[in-house]
UniProtKB/Swiss-Prot annotation:
Superkingdom per UniProt: Bacteria
Cofactor: [4Fe-4S] cluster
Keyword Membrane listed: yes
Pfam families recorded: Fer4_7 (PF12838)
Name listed for the protein in its UniProt record: NAD(P)H-quinone oxidoreductase subunit I
The protein's assembly and partners: NDH-1 is composed of at least 11 different subunits.
EC number, UniProt record: 7.1.1.-
Reaction(s) the record says it catalyses: a plastoquinone + NADH + (n+1) H(+)(in) = a plastoquinol + NAD(+) + n H(+)(out); a plastoquinone + NADPH + (n+1) H(+)(in) = a plastoquinol + NADP(+) + n H(+)(out)
Functional description taken from the UniProt entry: NDH-1 shuttles electrons from an unknown electron donor, via FMN and iron-sulfur (Fe-S) centers, to quinones in the respiratory and/or the photosynthetic chain. The immediate electron acceptor for the enzyme in this species is believed to be plastoquinone. Couples the redox reaction to proton translocation, and thus conserves the redox energy in a proton gradient.
Comment on bound cofactor: Binds 2 [4Fe-4S] clusters per subunit.
Main location: membrane
GO cellular component: plasma membrane-derived thylakoid membrane
Amino acid sequence: MAGFFQQVTEYTRNAISAGKYLLQGLAVTFDHMGRRPITVQYPYEKLIPSERYRGRIHYEFDKCIACEVCVRVCPINLPVVDWVMNKETKKKELRNYSIDFGVCIFCGNCVEYCPTNCLSMTEEYELAAFDRHSLNFDNVALGRLPTSVTTDPSVKSLREFAYLPEKVFDPHEVLPTEPRAGKLPEEVLDWMKAETTDKKVMESSSNNFKEGDKP
């Protein structure tokens, strides 16, 4: 009889332990159900790149003076600059300019050291191709401006992944009912413009007040 009660007690203890572990697992599941989504449904949704994002290089042919500074500062001597010397003007004439993005490491040295600012980094990062030779962009392909994520009608940009509110270090701490994590870049610009306008109004009013005090 004592053995029977011992078996019942052990079975009950095991059942309670199993239920506790089951509830712990469900608690983790329910905790993640209330969190904000992190996964991006690419390519239907895209994150907005940062302001200084180093994407595909944009090239302006008319500004280039064929100085080849970009070639000298490139860690792998990647840009190919084809030019000839004009004997009449004694100046370089640019014929062709190309960059192979299959080899480029996007360090941004060429953009930083260009004396005429003919090179700039764009927000374009979709450079996948079936043929690696198609990644060798000439001056015509480099001159095309990319389509911005914020203006592309076929893409829903995730604007809620902007700046976090003050004193918030974890995006999951933001309530799910809130539409986004922080201010949008457009709202930040509007706030800066409004602040600049207020400063100008205050300065003009102070100047008028000083002029009124003069005899």
